[in-house]
Amino acid sequence: MVGADLSGIELRMFAHYLSHYDHGRYGEILLNGDIHQVNADKIGISRKLVKTVTYAFLYGAGDEKIGLSYDPQLSPAKAKQKGAEIRQAYLDAIEGLEKLVNEAKEKVRTDGYLRAIDGRYIAVDGSHKALNYLLQSGAGCIAKRWMVIANENIKQLNIEAHQLGFIHDELQFECNPAHADTLMFNLELAAAQAGEYYNLRIPIAAEASTGTTWADTH
């Protein structure tokens, strides 16, 4: 078996959209530094916590949930207050983030939809979901295009392989053992090609591995 996962696809989509406002700064740190540590230093919380806050923020968590991630013992009111403070500190720490969020929310409030990276209309039933829908739709488009390109390359290169699964941002194949290395290279290359297909402003990458079971390649 050969499997591959897209590398940090949500944060790469985040960097892609932020580049309109920060001239690629977030993406540069994401690729070449430690973006969670940089944000932790700015906000004044631990790296572990800022990572939790980042994904809570991107997935649309409310203030109370963010506050409880900081301290599970807080009352609902205190958690909501603390979460609001952390949210604002997070917005202030990342150049262009507040503008990105506000513009996405305004688009949803005005039109009721967003446009994905492939041009499709995405109906959004609440402005607080705008950023999450933007990033998740982008990640989904990239993952599906990655699968298409990978399979096209497999045919062109005459790799003896058969796709077993497509799980979120992961592809799994069975293949001739002699073709495993070529297939791994192809899956990593196809991820980069998927990003180029949509003219993303940050490169897309994947990490491939081989083994005899899904436990080895997942």
Residue ranges and their predicted role:
Residues 1-218:
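Conserved catalytic core of nucleotide polymerization and phosphodiester-bond processing enzymes
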